[in-house]
């Protein structure tokens, strides 16, 4: 199925198609909209999904969250992380450069947000979650760098 919007109606349409076919897994190919629709539909149908991005513009290609429009408002919905990711660099490299720049910004923002959170925890007693932190970045690599600096 081809999706033009990341709306709950598209998720429901994908669910119906998956149920009618008896699908064992779903595949999201393209950008955020297609991947988010497949991500949420797959969890609602109870099957894994595979993410096949065509641009590296954000971390949604590998996250367990789906951004959807529900009742006219964009919201983040808990779904599931992909069972696998197939990223063809020959295809991704053909995407507009602004999308790659956006993806780099997304990665940097995740790293700095977690560091800000840790600092607020140390200085102000802000509640901190190692689990949530690990979802944002590779904790072990960052902690290794912390010990070296």
Put a short name on every predicted segment.
Residues 18-41, 45-54:
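A short, small-residue-rich loop immediately preceding and capping a beta-strand
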Residues 5-9, 35-37, 60:
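Short active-site-adjacent helix-start/loop capping segments
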Residues 1-25, 95, 102:
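ATP/NTP phosphate-donor binding region
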Residues 12-15, 35-37, 71-73:
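A generic local structural motif
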Residues 3-6, 33, 56, 92:
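Glycine-/small-residue-rich active-site loops that bind phosphorylated ligands and cofactors
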Residues 43-145:
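A glycine/threonine-rich phosphate-anchoring loop and its flanking beta-alpha core
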